[in-house]
């Protein structure tokens, strides 16, 4: 169940790891193996990342949720032993059409992009050795266009860094632990926002319930299309997560997640529909959620408010733990994931729920 709300008013420098794996086009272009990503250690939890276009053509890469993104997104996965360290930044739902030019980064042939970030800003780190790896997908459009035409899968080298916990914990977090939560939806959101959000969450609950049932006892072929396995254990996890989403979408006044209809953290930039703060279990709708999406779509794999909300609820660990990540945006990227990645990919759930509803 969810509460809907609105806002009122020095370790040693380490040797660089040069070995890297190259990124490859999922859809099998002739010019695959065109990007090379390398992680290197800085002071304490600081990571230097380089992305090099080793191909012969420029690449027009979507920034959101990648190493090109300036926001506190999940740029690397962090592990303590075999256990993933929870991410405490933001996860955003992105409009897949009518994208703005500024949400892309063009990387010329032979060009290298460099970025440096402190993993302690979005992870709680103690004094131990941590493993860092950058892995995921990047949507790509033709140069001069903003229409997504392909997806790139990437995996960097593995980097191990001994972290000074006291120094890491003194680092200011990108997202504060809590914020003032004074105004609930009914007294803060506009009438139109309240109506549209209420309708969307009602459909979200219906779609999640139907998809949960399908995951448990529906077509194995359809399930495998989105989650790349028919294993009973995986079907059970997917069904349970979707059932939990249905519960969250079923209430506007109570529960373990908090839902806002205004941009309380100021991350509603171009083409962002909504975002989730996993560490605080807060979900925020952006203006585009209301202006660019229908409440519910009857088109296969199209975006709407209901499935966007469903997508966001899977991110929140209070809905079902662990929360999902953004391992692949859109149908082509989502169905190219491994089963292990798909079961933790928010869009896989939204796309599957849409497919069960529409009959894709």
From Swiss-Prot:
Q: What class of enzyme is it?
A: hydrolase
Looking up Gene3D superfamilies in the UniProt record yields: 2.60.40.2970, Collagenase (Catalytic Domain) (3.40.390.10)
Q: How is the cofactor bound?
A: Binds 1 zinc ion per subunit.
Annotated active site: 312
Q: What are the glycosylated positions?
A: 129
Instruction: Tell me yes or no: is RNA-binding among this UniProt entry's keywords.
Output: no
A single GO molecular function term of this UniProt record: metal ion binding
Top-rank taxon, per record:
Eukaryota
State its location(s).
Answer: Secreted
Catalyzed reactions per annotation: Preferential cleavage of bonds with hydrophobic residues in P1'. Also 3-Asn-|-Gln-4 and 8-Gly-|-Ser-9 bonds in insulin B chain
Provide GO CC annotations from the record. extracellular region
Give a GO biological-process term: proteolysis
Describe the family membership recorded for this protein in Swiss-Prot or TrEMBL: Belongs to the peptidase M35 family.
Q: What is this protein called?
A: Neutral protease 2 homolog SS1G_13741
User: Can you name the source organism?
Assistant: Sclerotinia sclerotiorum (strain ATCC 18683 / 1980 / Ss-1) (White mold)
